[in-house]
Amino acid sequence: MASKTYTAGVKDYRETYWEPDYKIKDSDLLAVFKVTPQPGVDREEAAAAVAAESSTGTWTTVWTDLLTDLEHYKGRAYKVEDVPGDDEAFYAFIAYPIDLFEEGSIVNVFTSLVGNVFGFKAVRALRLEDVRFPLHFVMTCPGPPNGIQVERDKMNKYGRPLLGCTIKPKLGLSAKNYGRAVYECLRGGLDFTKDDENVNSQPFMRWRDRFEFVMEAIQKAEEETGERKGHYLNVTAPTPEEMYKRAEFAKELGAPIIMHDYITAGFCAHQGLANWCRDNGMLLHIHRAMHAVLDRNPNHGIHFRVLTKILRLMGGDQLHTGTVVGKLEGDRQSTLGWIDLLRKPYIEEDRSRGLFFDQDWGAMPGAFAVASGGIHVWHMPALLSIFGDDAVFQFGGGTLGHPWGNAAGAAANRVALEACVKARNEGRELEKEGKEILTEAAKSSPELKAAMETWKEIKFEFDTVDKLDTAHR
């Protein structure tokens, strides 16, 4: 009989993975989870269980523990905090040694942090609230293929946000009629038009036909306006091979930008496409379709600030972030937080905006924040005040819903934007004087006047579901 060299039995997670005196290292990957434990499971045990199951642990002692250095590789729960206004949940702060993760692989990081641990019976609900990616890891990630400044240089557009429009109806148009709508919007004054997230290659409009008619529209609009124009050609496809085929065809046609649904398509496919864009000088617009499945429940899932961080790491030049003022979910302070995460080189911890950690991006370029969803000309002063210049404002229905047509809708948005930028540069307070600014601009723009009349009663005043914790406001 073999001699006994270790103590068998079910593990007490707290004994191994709870270390309140742990000294955090610069190279550690830090995560904070909102944990709702099962009745009878205390906080320290639940936090330690999350640390174990998301790193080196299993439910029982195994003899192969003797063949590795557990102290070096294990995750450590080092702090718990109350969740303001919630008597059941708490925050668990966990430090992971960087050697647990493959360099530059968000796929690998997420497989640990939001993998099997989310089905662990010791917790009733679990939400990944924030992650501090150490600079050691950030430097191994590709980041945005181009970044804000390079995109401005490619498009020759400075000193203001960019204007876009999602072509509507999103499904059902023929390729030729789709191209016509693109031309009218770009000719009217927009910088970009866009495929919607579920426009791929359906029977009513195959992708190759769409690409050709859209590029014809872009070239015509550029010739007539003297401005650089673009359209987000969605290359999302059933397979990576098909995705690259579509991207290559867009490049052959001379498209400046393509688009990808980074969550539904998968992180592996997305990071590969971002690398392709970098190698081929192509701008990359990112749609976040499916994000609310992951981030809207305030107790279980992944917060959007984490999805923002991983997109910047994997690569994207523009990302939908919500609008605050439109029809989609988005608390103002939280939105301001993840806008900064997308654009700035260094972000300090700020609980009032939901930021649990400092985040150093090193030399990694930032990306444009995209405001889209239920916005129209009356929102322009607030949008410019909230987002600043390094953003894209996309008016879908707020362009194509204009009573005089697509070109008039585009012209109204362009006039409204330029009026607000001028007022901002003169030192006026946009959110206080917005109505006056727009009304004055409308005197010389019948398109803007008609748009203001059309949407003067349109508001989206539903309360936000996923709010910052009350004590952090």
Swiss-Prot record:
Q: Which GO terms describe its biological process?
A: reductive pentose-phosphate cycle
The record's comment on protein family reads: Belongs to the RuBisCO large chain family. Type I subfamily.
Q: Which residues carry this modification: N6-carboxylysine?
A: K194
Keyword Oxidoreductase attributed:
yes
What's the protein called, per UniProt? Ribulose bisphosphate carboxylase large chain
Q: Which gene encodes it?
A: cbbL
Give the PANTHER family listed for this entry.
RIBULOSE BISPHOSPHATE CARBOXYLASE (PTHR42704), RIBULOSE BISPHOSPHATE CARBOXYLASE LARGE CHAIN (PTHR42704:SF17)
InterPro entries the UniProt entry points to: RuBisCO, RuBisCo_large_chain_AS, RuBisCO_lsu_C, RuBisCO_lsu_C_sf, RuBisCO_lsu_fd_N, RuBisCO_lsu_N_sf, RuBisCO_lsuI
**GO molecular function per UniProt:** magnesium ion binding; monooxygenase activity; ribulose-bisphosphate carboxylase activity
Relate the assembly described in the record: Heterohexadecamer of 8 large chains and 8 small chains.
* Entry-linked HAMAP family: RuBisCO_L_type1 (MF_01338)
Q: What else is known?
A: The basic functional RuBisCO is composed of a large chain homodimer in a 'head-to-tail' conformation. In form I RuBisCO this homodimer is arranged in a barrel-like tetramer with the small subunits forming a tetrameric 'cap' on each end of the 'barrel'.
Which cofactors, if any, are listed as required?
Mg(2+)
Q: Where is this site: Transition state stabilizer?
A: K327
Organism superkingdom = Bacteria
Which reaction does this chain catalyze? Answer: 2 (2R)-3-phosphoglycerate + 2 H(+) = D-ribulose 1,5-bisphosphate + CO2 + H2O; D-ribulose 1,5-bisphosphate + O2 = 2-phosphoglycolate + (2R)-3-phosphoglycerate + 2 H(+)
Where does the chain bind Mg(2+)? K194, D196, E197
Q: Which residues bind substrate?
A: N116, T166, K170, R288, H320, S372
Q: Which residues form the active site?
A: K168 (proton acceptor), H287 (proton acceptor)
Pfam families given in the database record: RuBisCO_large, RuBisCO_large_N
